[in-house]
From Swiss-Prot:
GO-annotated biological processes: translation
Disordered: annotated segments: 92-118
Keywords: Ribonucleoprotein, Ribosomal protein, RNA-binding, rRNA-binding, tRNA-binding
Quaternary state and interactors: Part of the 30S ribosomal subunit. Forms a loose heterodimer with protein S19. Forms two bridges to the 50S subunit in the 70S ribosome.
Protein name as annotated: Small ribosomal subunit protein uS13
Function according to Swiss-Prot or TrEMBL: Located at the top of the head of the 30S subunit, it contacts several helices of the 16S rRNA. In the 70S ribosome it contacts the 23S rRNA (bridge B1a) and protein L5 of the 50S subunit (bridge B1b), connecting the 2 subunits; these bridges are implicated in subunit movement. Contacts the tRNAs in the A and P-sites.
Listed PROSITE patterns: RIBOSOMAL_S13_1 (PS00646), RIBOSOMAL_S13_2 (PS50159)
Any one GO cellular component localisation term in the record: cytosol
Disulfide bonds, paired cysteine numbers: none
Any GO MF annotation of the entry: rRNA binding
Similarity remark: Belongs to the universal ribosomal protein uS13 family.
Amino acid sequence: MARIAGVNLPAQKHVWVGLQSIYGIGRTRSKKLCESAGVTSTTKIRDLSEPEIERLRAEVGKYVVEGDLRREIGIAIKRLMDLGCYRGLRHRRGHPLRGQRTRTNARTRKGPRKAIRK
């Protein structure tokens, strides 16, 4: 089991799939990382040699991933809320940000229904 960016990658999966278990790496970036590290993307993680794992670590290290990315996103949202702009207010209230309707639907963002008090 290889450990990259503080995440244990599942040994039985292909490299390009396993890299996606790192927060901030999706399909496209995963395949580009394999290509730039010189690793065949369809190789299983358990079959990687130590130099290949090191090359992957170096390539992943060039991107903001995991805790640093989560922190950056949190800071960006907090900045919007502190500014008091429309998007910040929507974050603060827990409503959808991008113009979706809220009269019906939007339950995922708003949470479960609140009981009506009389």
